[in-house]
Amino acid sequence: MKTTRTSAISVLVFVVGLPAGVANADFTFGEPIQLVEPIWSPGHDPQGCCFSGDGLELYFSSNRPGGYSGKDLWVATREALDASWGEPVNLGLSVNGAGSQVEPAISPNGLELYFGDWSDRNIRVCKRTSKDAPWSSPEFLDPPIGLGNELQADFSADGLSLYFSSSRSGTYGKGDIWVSTRATTDDPWAEPTNLGPNVNTSGSEGYPSISSDGRILFFNHGTHIWMTKRANKSDTWAPLVNCNIIGAPPMFDPAISPDGSVLYFETGYAMWQSSITPIVDLNGDRTVDSADMCIIVDNWGTDNSLCDIGPMPWGDGVVDVQDLIVLAEHLFEEMPGRPIEP
């Protein structure tokens, strides 16, 4: 990384002073790829998944053979982020029981597991003292979150915020996305807050998945996957935007990887993944070159989202060396035409 950073800075010195162009950047979703064995095969109906904090574990719900009930929770591991998933392991009878256990959410430290059950609308909690210890028996999540109409939880990267879907009093429609916070991972959850009218509508919103930097929230609105963005963790959420992932709806259960490079979701009783890539051809001339680097230099230190392309695909809120590093990785590449705006 040090070598890459040094090279990027060297290129920056080269391009300073050159004329800048018009910025025109964003990020795109790649064509979806269906997951195959050992994670999914025909006849195995998934129902939600989530990544561990390091991205090396995938927790998911499935009716695959070897389970104890209708749908069980499983975990698959991999050696590296670019490695294939290994054979899934059932979480066992301490977690899985009668009915169907669905929509798992694993805490960043790996010691708390939240999930739903089709028998009711209650979030259940299993805990363990270490990653090598067995899971405790499930217990209902206590109020103020657990009121009997909550589902589809997801943790923030620090484990101090919990996003979930609920039709409790105060919703704007049939079901809204709420968030609750806690001071430490040992403290109880505070009174939940509705994410507001920019996110929640008169329809139904659910299946939240928060990015590791806390700046992008993916979720379901109707039968499509949508997202909302904010400048930082203390800012308000922007109006929801359709992700426009290639393929026919319905699409459900989005799960963003910790590095923001891929989105998992479900459609047609199968699990799929779509890559997320920043558009590095900033001036739209289909070539990444010094003109694009000049655009970054011209916007250096600003919060111009059109030039903010790193380290996450949607940037980090400021145009700086992280964006230059990402651009340098694609220098002199030819790019396809920009996608047509919806």
Give the predicted meaning of each segment.
Residues V13-F14, G43, G92, G196, ...:
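Generic detector of short alpha-helix boundary/capping microenvironments
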Residues T277-P342:
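Cellulosome-associated attachment modules in secreted, modular CAZymes
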Residues M1-V11:
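Bacterial N-terminal signal peptides that target proteins for export
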Residues V22-P278:
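Short, conserved micro-motifs composed of acidic
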Residues T4, L18-P19, C49, D289-S290, ...:
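Alpha-helical interaction segments
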Residues I9-P19:
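Bacterial N-terminal signal peptides
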